[in-house]
Amino acid sequence: MYDIFRCVVHKAKTGCQWEHLFVDLECVKYPFSWQTVYYYHSKWIKAGVYEKAFFAILIEYQLLLDTEKLNLDGTHTLVKKAAESAKYQHRKKGRTSNVLVLTDGRGYPIGIGDIISGNHNDLYDIIGLFSKIMNQIKKCGIFVENSYLNADKGFDCKKLRRAIHRRKMFPNIKENPRNRKGNKRGKKRFFDEKVYKKRFVNERSFAWIDSFRTKTVRNIFNYRNKNTFLKDLLRNGLQFL
């Protein structure tokens, strides 16, 4: 089983086709076949093995996580062929899917939202997605009270700030002027520039994930399979970054 898992990781990293899996992979020999690897990979996805492994690693290493500063951001994946939750995104010049990822202070992924179409902005169904991410963290027993949650100005809204406050965290979100010419009335919102700069560890994590070429372009129709496979990649990132 370990060799099969190594083959799956190799496929994800190189982006090769399944039938070409063993062209440059010498760690396994006959009677292995790419059909065997694909069979177990599909079986593990349907059984939720990757997702369970992701949560198991978070539970095992939760004391090593830097939960004092959390970071929320989204990442887009280009979509080829027909696929669920895929729409045109003008910045990427193509059809994309988007997923929200919550990382700790070092950039390790600790929570992942559902995949949504790429034509939506960052605030689309933000409360539902954020609640699901926080439920994942709670399930793993990760303590996040009194933490700073960094997010860019695309996430600046009252609903999200209230949701963060309800969980006894501090929303460190850059204010979005939204075409205002003057200063906003009322009490000035909390914002720590030094803590906010730490959120760029997300870019390192997303760059590492993008090094997995299978993830760079989505060819899988069912969004649940893709989400599970993404969790597998993030699980590896949590272990080896």
Question: Language-model features: where?
Answer:
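Short alpha-helical elements
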Residues: M1-L241
